Each structure stands twice: as structure tokens, then as C-alpha cells.
Amino acid sequence: MQFELSDEQLEFQKSLRRMISDRSPIKSVREVIKTDAGWDESLWQQFADQAGLPALLVPEEYDGAGATLVEAMLVMEELGRGIVPSPYFATTAFGVVPILTFGSETQKQELLPSVAAGEITLTTALTEPSGNWGPDGVEMVAAGSGETVTLSGTKSFVIDGHTADKIIVVAKAGDQYGLYIVDGDASGLTRTKQTTLDLTRPMATLEFDNVAATGLGEPGGWDRISHVLDVAATLLAAEMVGAMEASMTMAVEYAKVRNQFSRAIGSFQGIKHRLSEMAVEVDTSRAATWYAAYAGAEGLDDFPTAALVAKATAAAGFAFTASWTVQVHGGIGFTWDHDAQLYYRKAKSTELLLGSTTDTWLELADRIGV
């Protein structure tokens, strides 16, 4: 099949790339990651006001843009390219998607316009101290029944969990799984920012002590949550594609100017092979990711498998590319002053997000019956 971006999509991507280059260069990223929030609130508001990023997947009837997963994919690719710390991923994949999928009309009317305007951020608290992203990792139980329940326990590795205005918590409800909305400043909720390898994706530990929560739709099977994770996997893959390409470009440019034995190191066969392999990883990962986004946008039956293929392929490719970018740079690539290590940190951390690459391939095997 032939899949190409439209002229409008290409122009949108280019304009976003320019905005990120002007407003969030790597030098600014290094300053932002030192802050308590871990992301730039003024940049987020600019993304909302000038580019409409938080409104992309919000339907027009809720003051959104009514775009598709393809446009959201393009956003993530550019955010990854600039390793921009931003609540876009959590708010979109772990906020807008579950609300659209499971929320009541009242909840959609209440939350989505504020999201579209960039007024509130969202996230989902799924993993617990075990770090397991599957159903076996959920031990928190929703106490009570009906529209309002209470939650007690611990959630870990919650993306933007220390700053999100609304948190969607995954908890057991009998033999099913429920999603529950909690205010970020709810009584009994303690939020602690975690120290993580990827400095550009802040995470938090959330302690719940009889915290009041409102159900997001009715409890159901894990397949409901799998859909949210599939969308997240596709967007995460797109972010890795952008970061991977930026990392590769960094290595290529350095190989052109770094001389050894009176010639550029890029002229040596060993370096040429590694750079060529990086290009293969980028193109392969982009192809898998674009198809997954297309399948999700069109509602194709193979979206669940395509999402896992994209995530696993991009995770392996990004880990390879970021690692060899450091190697091509030699000793300087390991230093704090060089940007190569920021991409390497993101690669190794993202490789485990939503489950390791091995876990992803095993889940794919289960889905296709192997």
C-alpha cells in the first residue's frame, strides 16, 4: 500500500518543527528539566494557543480540532526530535483517549473543552511499585460501588503525575478493572516526583489514602485498557522515531568533521556501517509507526497488532541508534555537556515504558495466536 502525508499535514509538521526549534532548543530543555514541574508551562500554553496541540484529538463538539491519530503522531515525532519535556503525551494518550472511550457525555463536556484550551493536563496512573504494565500488576482495589469510590495504595512511574490536574486511576473492581478520575489536589493524595533516567519525561509516585474518586464509565475487562495502551504505544513509537532521527543526524554530522589519522572518521568503513544501520532503523521504525497511526485513524482491525509492532521496532531501533551515537562521539559522548547522553537516557527509559521490548513481542505473539 502507498501511504503519504497530505500537504496540510506536512506543513503542520514543518511549522511545529520551526516552533520547537525557536522556542525550545536543547539549551532551554536543559534548563527546564531542572525545574520542579519538569516542563515549561508557558511553552505548553503556546502549543495550545498557536498550534492547538492539546485540542488535536478532541472532537469539534467539545471545542477541539477533531484530528486523527496521524496528526497526533506527527506531533510526537517532532517533540521527540527536540526531546521536548511536555505534558502532551500523558494528556493525549492517557487523558483524552480514555475520556473519549469510556467517559459519559457529562464528563466529556466537563473536561475536554478545558483540555483543548490547554487549561488542564491529564494523566493515567496504572503501574504500581512492581512496574508491571499488564493486568497482573494492578493490585489497587476500588472500595465501594456506584459513581463514587475510594482508593488506597500506591501508583508508581506515573507520567507527569506530580503536576497533572486530573488523574485517571486504574483499579480493580471485583473481577473487572475500573477507571476512576481523581483531582490532582484531592484530600489524601500525596504526590512525589521520582528520579528517573529520562530527565525529559518526569514521573511521580502517588500515595492514595482513602481518596475519593469518580468512575469513568463502567468497569470492564482489560481489553478496554489495552486500547488506551495501544494508542499510547503508537504515539510513543512516533516520539522515538523523531528522537532516533535526531540522534542519527548528530552522529552523521560529527563523523563528517571529526578527523583521525588525517581523515574524517565518517570515511572509515566501521563508522559507515553503523551510520547506515542507523538509517535503516529510522526508516523501518517510521514505516511501522506510520502504518500503526493510519490503522488507528481508520479503525482497522489490525491496529492492536500494528501498535505493538511499531512500539517494539522503534524501541529496539532507538536503543541501537542512541547507543551508537554515543560511541561515534567517543569520550565526549559520555559527558553531561554533550546532548548525545540525553537521547541515550530517553532511549533506555522509553524502551521499558508500557513494558519492555521483550514483553511487547510476547504480547504481540499472544494477540496473533503464536
Task: Outline where the language-model segments fall.
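Alpha-helical interface subdomain recognition
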Residues: 1-83, 102-105, 114, 118-119, ...
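Structural signature of FAD isoalloxazine-binding scaffolds in flavoprotein oxidoreductases
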Residues: 66-75, 134-138, 182, 210-212, ...
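N-terminal glycine-rich flavin-associated loop
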Residues: 86-106
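Short beta-strand-to-turn element immediately C-terminal to the catalytic PLP-Schiff-base lysine
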Residues: 101-103, 143, 169-172, 181-184, ...
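A short, Trp-centered hydrophobic/proline-enriched beta-strand micro-motif
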Residues: 118-129
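A generic structural signal for well-ordered coil/turn residues at beta-strand boundaries
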Residues: 120, 134-138, 163-165, 176, ...
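A short core secondary-structure module
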Residues: 125, 152-189
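Flexible, small-/acidic-enriched active-site or ligand-binding loops
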Residues: 137-139, 157-158, 183-217
